[in-house]
Amino acid sequence: MGGLYSEYLNPEKVLEHYNYTKETLDMQETTSRKVASAFIIILCCAIVVENLLVLIAVARNSKFHSAMYLFLGNLAASDLLAGVAFVANTLLSGHVTLSLTPVQWFAREGSAFITLSASVFSLLAIAIERQVALAKVKLYGSDKSCRMLMLIGASWLISLILGGLPILGWNCLNQLEACSTVLPLYAKHYVLCVVTIFSVILLAIVALYVRIYFVVRSSHADVAGPQTLALLKTVTIVLGVFIICWLPAFSILLLDSTCPVRACPVLYKAHYFFAFATLNSLLNPVIYTWRSRDLRREVLRPLQCWRRGKGVTGRRGGNPGHRLLPLRSSSSLERGMHMPTSPTFLEGNTVV
């Protein structure tokens, strides 16, 4: 094992693995590649700004300090960090890749895996919360904030461990025949294990939402009311967008784990699949704010304050420091604002 870790600072190891798994090493900085990198960086900056606005909105307004919004904020935090990780990955790609040491390469790729893991576990937590809220179960008790934070902390700890396994030793250094083509320093078995775990979790989430849907459709009174159906629709949209964005990347990684080296040319185009997957982190904040008028108002407030600071006053401008006023119901998502709530979340304020 000591011999393995001694290779972590060897600057020639990355080149050795790329030479083995790639047919050609096209690392030149062409104009098209520079344009693509610039576009991805701009996209990631938008991801960071959007999710930061969601986090600020959730943190600054006590109206959103419910279980559901804490999990929503956790998902926004993972998306924000994903944007940062994608920027770092882009800046350290291309010709820069071959100058990295293995430990730097593991840090570059591991950060993306950690944020992806956090997103998957956040979706699982949201699904469980929906089930708990539907069953009216008092899950968190009097110290609910502490327990929810512990749950969120545990999800990040598991994500760190899962994303850090390669740097801890589960890699293919000195075992070229076991290497992934898409991620040349990762062992194929590790890639297969991670994708399998994510796929099983996502299937479990889908099954849970199907169960919730049938329970809601077969129930009466407030359980099957428009408020509950609107919440179910929102979480379904969030989950559906995640699956649509990440399914191509998961598929290419599954193919990578079973395909012999240099036998599947499509694997050399994997970066397009991962670029498409980044759209998920961009779309999530749009979904939150589209489905909740209150959250949309709170998210846009910093932008309105900035415009006032620039001397541009909107028609409904006012004191930047005023409190968030109650909103009139304008959709099924807000009609249940004063319905009885369960201990796990505030029905009128939940967006997912």
Curated annotation (Swiss-Prot):
One of its GO terms (cellular component) is presynapse. Residues 333-352 are annotated as: Disordered. This is Sphingosine 1-phosphate receptor 2. A lipid is attached at residue 305 (S-palmitoyl cysteine). It is found in: Cell membrane. The lineage of its organism: Eukaryota, Metazoa, Chordata, Craniata, Vertebrata. GO terms for molecular function: G protein-coupled peptide receptor activity; G protein-coupled receptor binding; integrin binding; sphingosine-1-phosphate receptor activity. Belongs to the G-protein coupled receptor 1 family.
